[in-house]
Structures are given as structure tokens and as C-alpha cells.
Amino acid sequence: MIRRKCGRLYGIGIGPGDPKLLTLKAKEIIDQADIIFCPKGDEYGTSWARSIIETTTSAPKEFVDLRFPMTRNKKVLKAYWKKAARRIAEEVTKGKQGAFITLGDPFIYSTYIYLLRTLRQNFPDIEVETIPGISAFNAAAARAQIPLVQGDERMAILPVRKDLRGLREAFETFDTVILMKVGSKLDKVMALLAELDLLKHSVLVSRIGQPGEKIIHDLSSLEKIEKEGYLSVIIVKISEKENLT
């Protein structure tokens, strides 16, 4: 890693949760970084991303937790993005090489996207390099052994909104639909899938690569077990003629 008068920030995707899914380049940069910035949602909790990285590096590291609260209030979020950007700039402008770690891929529904935009607006002289990571839905497909698309099939990736906006249209338009940010909306999603006779064409993978990982090939069975919406991805294969069981 080349040293500069002003350091550089690396935005690093660390994958879905399994430390072994960290890419070689990501691990190399993390091992060489002077300081690692870790996002967390709860003021008093720990950073999940940090707990993953702490198991992969033996070199002494300076860790800095950056809080990004779980809220949709843009005014509140912008204040935290600016605070995080200032904290990063404070260290990187000293010549330190920094790594901001994020689950999955940095450019897929990641806090890093907003942080990068804030850095560009307020600290344009700081060099930033983004390192891709394995996304949750890629890992979910691999764990469940489900091809995402083949031939001329089309795929959509959607976050689940409270009103399920756009889901019905996606199921009618695409061959494969990936549902992310399922969370507490799982019951509503299941009801829609049942209405469209898609429960047996859907697979849910939760806590991918983590202790307690679950792979459920028939969502109708979710009624008999604990609901698993948190940290989950649902893959719906509309084009499959056979059930995914």
C-alpha cells in the first residue's frame, strides 16, 4: 500500500457474514490499514461488521465505531453522515490509511453510499477507493443452490416497503425477484406470495454465513416455525416450472 501525505479511504464490502467469504483484496487492505471504521446502528451495541473483521486480522488495529441510527428521518441521518465524514477526514488527513467496512457489497443498499456522497461534497480532496464484496443475495443463491438467471431471463432486486409497493408488478414482469430488507414485513410478503401461488417457488435464507443460518425452501412452512424476517433474503423464481423444494 502506497503511503501518501493525505491518506486514502477504502470502502470495503466484507460479504454477507462468513469471514471466509472476504475477498483476498479486501483482506489485504484491511490487514494494511491504519484505522478501521465500523458502522453500527445501536448507540450502545456493537458493530456486526467489526465483529466479523476482528476474527480475520491478527495485526493490532485501531477501530472506530460510527453510528448510523435505524431511522428514515433524512434530517437526522444527514447529521450522522456528516459527523461520520468529519471523523474519517480527521484521521485520513493525518496520512492514515482508513478502511470503512460494510456488509455485503458497498454499492448495494449500503450506508457507505451516503457516506461516500457526503465525503465527496465536504472533503473532495480525500481519495476514496471502493472494494466490491459478495452480496447477500449472491451468497443466498449459492447456499440454497438456486440459479438466479439463465439464458434470456430477467431479474429484479427490490427492498420490501411497508406497503409492498412494486412487488406485485415485479412478480408479473420478471423471471426472478430478489427481496431484501424483509424484516418485519415478512407476514405481508408471505400473504402476497400465497395469493399469487408463489410460496413453493420461493426460498428464504436468513443470517447467511452466520451462526443460526436457516435455508427454507417452502415458505408455507414458516407458519409452523419462528418467523425469520430479520437479516433475510427471499429469492422468488417465477420462471421455475418445478417447485423449489
What are these regions (language model features)?
Residues 76-85, 143-146, 170-173, 215-222:
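Short, surface-exposed amphipathic charged segments that create phosphate/polyanion-binding patches used
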Residues 43-46, 71, 135-138, 186, ...:
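Short gly/pro/ser/thr-enriched loop/turn and capping motifs at secondary-structure boundaries
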Residues 1-19, 24-26, 31-127, 190, ...:
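Class I S-adenosyl-L-methionine
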Residues 2-5, 28-29, 92, 100, ...:
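Solvent-exposed alpha-helices and their adjacent loops that cap or buttress functional pockets
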Residues 16-17, 41-44, 68, 153-162, ...:
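Short, acidic/turn-prone active-site loops that include or flank metal/cofactor-
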Residues 9, 171-245:
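A contiguous loop/helix-start segment that scaffolds small-molecule binding in enzyme catalytic cores
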Residues 108-172, 224-225, 238-242:
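Class I SAM-dependent methyltransferase SAM-binding "motif I" and its flanking Rossmann-like core
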